[in-house]
């Protein structure tokens, strides 16, 4: 991947690609922790997300949403708790802005499409840009169905990422791979998010090989990564490892999130 000068319209893309390049140069996959915005509450979110951000190559923050079809019970409960505590879409972006003032690590927002439309696509992109967001992960937006979102994101310097799954056809993988500007997100299993017992690579190597035929983009893997051993498995084939539910479970149990992040980050070494 050839580097290009950073401009207002490719800032997020360049920052994300630089993060992957640094991780690769150090012999590891990028470590990408996830936390639901405003969980367990707005004040604690800043502490927890700060601990994760300090150890991350890229941080993923989820917009809490009342109908998260792709999320398992752990992230659903986190969203419900955050929403009950008053964390709206706008408030999540304010929390990201506060994180950005303390740390320059790239941050991507995972959001379903409805919260974007509730705020207004142009306004959402403006707020995300002002908060220091580098990219968007859009799990329920087919890349060929709403080009306005991708165009607005690009205009505001935000990379866009779409998902592929083990059930994705080669034609679908090609479409998604070519539409992604930041990185490609491969779902390791069919179903919803969540740390799983016995999670294995399954169809992931095939998916990644196929995706890399169509686009020179980093490919990350998520859904089911729960510990250092699982992370190490994924790191052998992916450019980045996403861990979400394991951290939310740790917060709920009162465990040391920083220590868990250290373990999982170490697991990303090849």
From Swiss-Prot:
Record GO biological process: L-tryptophan biosynthetic process
Function summary: The alpha subunit is responsible for the aldol cleavage of indoleglycerol phosphate to indole and glyceraldehyde 3-phosphate.
Protein family according to the UniProt entry: Belongs to the TrpA family.
Keyword Lyase: yes
Keywords carried by this UniProt record: Amino-acid biosynthesis, Aromatic amino acid biosynthesis, Lyase, Tryptophan biosynthesis
Catalytic residues identified in the record: 60 (proton acceptor), 71 (proton acceptor)
Matching Pfam families: Trp_syntA
Leading EC class: lyase
Pathway this chain belongs to: Amino-acid biosynthesis; L-tryptophan biosynthesis; L-tryptophan from chorismate: step 5/5
The species this protein was found in: Deinococcus radiodurans (strain ATCC 13939 / DSM 20539 / JCM 16871 / CCUG 27074 / LMG 4051 / NBRC 15346 / NCIMB 9279 / VKM B-1422 / R1)
Claim: Ubl conjugation is one of the keywords in the record: no
EC assignment: 4.2.1.20
Quaternary structure and partners: Tetramer of two alpha and two beta chains.
Catalysed reaction equations from the record: (1S,2R)-1-C-(indol-3-yl)glycerol 3-phosphate + L-serine = D-glyceraldehyde 3-phosphate + L-tryptophan + H2O
Name assigned to this protein: Tryptophan synthase alpha chain
Assigned GO CC terms: cytosol
Top-level taxonomic group: Bacteria
């Amino acid at each position: 991947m050839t580097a290009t000068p950073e401009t207002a319209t490719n800032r997020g893309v360049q920052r994300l690609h630089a993060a992957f390049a640094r991780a690769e140069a150090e012999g590891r996959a990028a470590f990408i922790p996830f936390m639901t915005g405003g969980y367990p509450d707005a004040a604690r979110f800043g502490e927890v997300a700060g601990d994760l951000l300090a150890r991350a190559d890229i941080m993923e923050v989820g917009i809490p949403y009342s109908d998260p079809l792709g999320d398992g019970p752990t992230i659903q409960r986190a969203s419900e708790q955050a929403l009950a505590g008053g964390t709206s879409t706008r408030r999540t972006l304010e929390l990201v802005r506060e994180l950005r003032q303390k740390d320059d690590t790239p941050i991507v927002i995972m959001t379903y499409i409805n919260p974007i439309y509730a705020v207004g696509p142009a306004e959402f992109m403006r707020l995300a840009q002002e908060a220091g967001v580098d990219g968007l992960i859009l799990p329920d937006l087919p890349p060929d169905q709403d080009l306005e979102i991708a165009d607005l994101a690009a205009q505001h310097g935000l990379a866009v990422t779409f998902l592929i799954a083990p059930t994705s056809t080669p034609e679908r993988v090609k479409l998604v791979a070519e539409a992604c500007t930041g990185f490609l997100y491969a779902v390791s299993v069919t179903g919803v998010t969540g740390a799983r017992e016995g999670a294995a690579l399954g169809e992931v190597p095939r998916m990644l090989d196929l995706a890399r035929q169509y686009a020179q983009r980093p490919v990350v893997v998520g859904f089911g990564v729960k510990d250092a051993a699982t992370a190490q498995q994924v790191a052998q084939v992916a450019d980045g490892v996403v861990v979400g539910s394991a951290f939310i479970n740790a917060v709920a149990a009162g465990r040391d999130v920083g220590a868990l992040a250290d373990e999982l980050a170490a697991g990303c070494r090849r």
